[in-house]
């Protein structure tokens, strides 16, 4: 499939999403694989192509909105395409964008069923690209993310320099028990310093 590139990296490209991507990839099926959604709020009920198309139409910023660099009130979500195989392997998102306080939340997911790429390189590069775009192109000053897994929280702190700002005790219901949720924050100046290390 020919993807419409938005941000170009060494190992991955971040691409614009539309109905064609949903119809011509296995994206919507990711949410039916329990390992992909184990620590997410989605995936508790079967997912269909129709639900994915509705999601694109109703929840995501359009290509035109993203390319205009104007304020958007919907989620900015980009596909992660592994360059060697030209395969859609993940998604990055920026949401709850506050243009007054200059903050937002980010998330990333990769399809754990796909094994023919270096997941760590892809995971690192796509998040780096998103952070750079949000801080240096959209001029945001602080970015938040979250995790319901302490190991993932610690990994995010180590790899990107986020700081743990809050712990919501027994917040998320996962595998039959309530787990803590960790809220992490990263200031633009801390990201600039962290990248130089």
Label the predicted regions.
Residues 1-115, 171, 177-197:
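GNAT-family acyltransferases
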Residues 22, 151-152:
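Short alpha-helical
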Residues 34-35, 138, 160:
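Structural motif
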Residues 105, 142, 152, 159:
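Amphipathic alpha-helical recognition patches that constitute DNA-binding helices
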Residues 110, 149-151:
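Active-site-proximal loop/turn and secondary-structure-junction residues that shape catalytic pockets
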Residues 117-133, 155, 159:
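Conserved acetyl-CoA-binding loop-helix of GNAT-fold acetyltransferases
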Residues 136-146:
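Conserved GNAT acetyl-CoA-binding A-motif
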Residues 144-147, 163-179:
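Conserved catalytic-core motifs of GNAT/GCN5-like acyltransferases
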